């Protein structure tokens, strides 16, 4: 019986060992990828206002913003995730939805972007077949950092300026109980169209708070101004993720961290350690059973009282 149990343990140990090694070597490259089931809304709030064409003055008041992000699953593949992102900036008046119609007086600005990113590095890839012809070619990071983010400078795409800028690592900071890496993006006097056919300049100082394990953006602040070429200020804006949005992002990131740790750490540890223990235990059982087995010749030559049979 011990031999049978031992052999079963050896077989089980071999299975666990292989499973643990596969999880350790193969799993990180599979699970540390941007998912293709993204369908999220990010909420920001702050103060802002745009110039009143009749008076030439800016009335600053409470504003809200939303970013609606979805993955186009049909256009995406194993290596690339294709995103459709719609952003709306609105006056915080009444019951404001995620976005309002173009003729709604509460609307301050709206835009829709299509882009494709590498599911491993999170960097934007060439548009190619992933987005419609004529779509602006972006570069750099956009809606997340890579898994296992580093304390270094990354290129970060700014859709308003139409250019990638350096996102420079600044510090570590706690957000809602989660350690984040803070990166700063500074844009000065970037030439833009303040309105259709109206040239001007754009300034922005962004700070992005990143979960270094998953690369998720936990919080973001943005201080932004836009000016006409005449020097008249056209937009004044200060935005940050809402407190609820930050809590949601932290909870989601922690859930993803636990899933990653299970697959990349605990399954390999349990598989490899458990497999080795089972193999060693199985071998010991087989060897012990072999040592306990009596010698047939010796048994035949000895009487029950312990005396040897006579030799002829």
Residue ranges of predicted features:
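Extended, hydrophilic extramembrane loops/domains of integral membrane proteins
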Residues: 210-256
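Extracellular or lumenal secretory-pathway regions
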Residues: 2-148, 257-261, 284-292
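Juxtamembrane interface at the cytosolic side of transmembrane helices
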Residues: 2-8, 258-312
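A generic "cationic amphipathic patch" detector
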Residues: 26-31, 190, 196, 228-233
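Membrane-proximal low-complexity regions enriched in glycine and acidic/polar residues
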Residues: 130-219, 226-227
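Charged, low-complexity helical/coil segments in non-catalytic cytosolic or luminal regions
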Residues: 112-114, 121-125, 134-139, 149-152, ...
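Ser/Thr- (and often Asn-) enriched beta-sheet segments in non-cytosolic proteins
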Residues: 59, 168, 184, 221, ...
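A broadly tuned preference for mixed-charge, low-complexity surface segments
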Residues: 70-76, 222-236, 265-275
């Amino acid at each position: 019986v011990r031999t049978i149990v031992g052999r079963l343990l050896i077989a089980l140990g071999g299975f666990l060992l292989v499973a643990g090694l596969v999880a350790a070597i193969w799993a990180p490259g599979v699970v540390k990828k941007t998912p293709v089931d993204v369908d999220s809304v990010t909420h920001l709030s702050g103060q802002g206002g745009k110039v009143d064409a009749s008076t030439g003055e800016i009335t600053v008041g409470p504003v809200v913003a939303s970013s609606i992000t979805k993955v186009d699953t049909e256009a995406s593949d194993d290596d690339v995730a294709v995103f459709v992102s719609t952003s709306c900036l609105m006056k915080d008046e009444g019951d404001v939805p995620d976005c309002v119609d173009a003729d709604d007086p509460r609307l301050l600005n709206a835009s829709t972007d299509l882009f494709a990113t590498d599911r491993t590095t999170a960097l934007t890839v060439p548009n190619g077949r992933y987005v419609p012809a004529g779509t602006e070619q972006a570069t750099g990071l956009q809606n997340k950092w890579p898994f296992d983010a580093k304390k270094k400078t990354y290129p970060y795409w700014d859709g308003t300026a139409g250019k990638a800028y350096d996102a420079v690592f600044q510090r570590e900071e706690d957000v809602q109980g989660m350690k984040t890496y803070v990166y700063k993006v500074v844009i000065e006097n970037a030439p833009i169209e303040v309105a259709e056919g109206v040239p001007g300049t754009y300034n922005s100082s962004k700070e992005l708070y990143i979960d270094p394990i998953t690369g998720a953006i936990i919080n973001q602040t943005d201080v932004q101004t836009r000016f006409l070429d005449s020097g008249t200020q056209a937009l004044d804006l200060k935005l940050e993720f809402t407190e609820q949005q930050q809590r949601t992002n932290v909870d989601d990131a922690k859930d993803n961290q636990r899933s990653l740790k299970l697959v990349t750490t605990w399954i390999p540890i349990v598989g490899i350690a458990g497999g080795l223990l089972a193999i060693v235990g199985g071998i010991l059982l087989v060897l012990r059973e072999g040592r306990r087995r009596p010698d047939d010749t010796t048994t035949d030559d000895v009487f029950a009282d312990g005396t040897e049979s006579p030799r002829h």
